[in-house]
Amino acid sequence: MLDRAEDFLGRVTFVTGPEKHCGKTTFLNRALALVRAAGERPAFLSVGYDGEARDSLSAARKPSVPVAAGDVVVSAERFLRDGRILPEILETLPGGSAFGRICVARANRSGRIVLVGPEGNQGVSRVLSFLRDEGAARTILVDGAINRITQVASWPGARFVFVLRTDAAGLDKAARQARRLSLLSTLKPVPAGFGAGEGEVLLAGPLTAATAAALPESVRGVSVEDFTKVFLEDGELRSFLSGRALFVGTPIECAGIVAVLRGVSRQTFLSRLDEGTASRVVFNPYELSPEAAA
């Protein structure tokens, strides 16, 4: 799982994570290398700004984003030209960014680049529509914003990879995040006609702890737009599901949970998970990539 080009080919895959420096961009680079090794040239973009050498707040070194000749990449025009990739501009997107116009370009030479992409769901959807409608790329990877899985819902059929990093001090928190996300991604689509029956509620807004507590005891089923509208912690969610059914209007597929461990054994991490969550976990699949081996 997530260690073959076939896991990404012909798909739109968002790479997400709960916090900065969780390994998102490193995983993106790994996935891109797999796709290229299979003879395909992917398209990729970031939601917002990424790719600087060091984080502006922590000064921690961030991985650069390599580009191969033939790749299609989205970024500010100035960064496309600074990356020495000899870009062929395919499209200039409406609006702009703090770094100037954002463009879709095809690289004619290999290099490294700073990614600057659209900020909102509408902007992401616009880019994906262009890439698919114009036949620019069959395989698309998106470096998603921190803790914003809602962006995946901007494109029907897209899926996401959740990357988290943990050490001994953060082990329990990481396990809770993994369990919660795994459970949310298994929620079933709302049945046809749901909401018309007794004890059925179609929520227009988010499901919070306060909302859940205010539901009458007679309510046996609740539906939300998608699982990103569920704001219940792992324990709260499991308690809610023990007495009620929870459905989603738009299911979002989880392709896997990538666990980057520091000073924690794989067995120790897995011991904190239920069977369903453990089956979704991949450990550092980018430890040896085609690029690293070259």
Positions of predicted regions on the chain:
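Short glycine-rich, polar/acidic loop-and-turn segments at beta strand-coil junctions
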Residues: G17-E19, S46-Y49, R78, G144-I146, ...
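Short active-site-adjacent helix-start/loop capping segments
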Residues: C22-G23, G51-D55, I149-Q151, G170
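N-terminal phosphate/diphosphate-binding loop that engages ATP/GTP or pyrophosphate donors
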Residues: A31-A107
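Walker A (P-loop) phosphate-binding motif
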Residues: L2-E52
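Short, glycine/acidic-enriched capping/hinge loops at junctions between secondary-structure elements
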Residues: T25-L28, A53-L57, K173-A174, T268-L270
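N-terminal charge/polar-biased segments
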Residues: M1-L9, A37-E40, L270-A294
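Conserved catalytic-core segment of NTP-binding enzymes
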Residues: G120, V124-T277, P290
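Short, basic, glycine/proline-bearing loop/turn elements
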Residues: V12-P18, R106-P118
